[in-house]
């Protein structure tokens, strides 16, 4: 099992790269919205308005991403020996004989770390909600597309 400190560092790097990319795209959209060519040619021309909507949406996503980075950076990597699953836990699940490893983090949900061997889940996600408070040996159930999935918590690190 990879170390949680290494996974945290990898997640922070991944989120940082994503933030830089989004900030570059946001700057380009803002420049496009205020560029001379974006001025409406008639009352039906909405290029500048569309660019401003896109810029506003990107700005909101940038704020969310910065909050995720701050949450992950502040994540305490405490011991989970004989403790229930909480933020910062590295969890190994078994579902029908197939093992999966998850990192419960405050941001970066869906990211794959350690060459794809570890998936990041967040507390608001269905799986994150189902995992919170569980102990090793307990079963986790969640409904996906009308079908119940049952997993067993093998280890918490």
List the predicted regions and their residue ranges.
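Helix-rich terminal scaffold detector
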Residues: 1-68
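Helix-adjacent hinge/juxtasegments
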Residues: 66-67, 71-85
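Non-DNA-binding regulatory cores of transcription-related proteins
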Residues: 79-147, 151
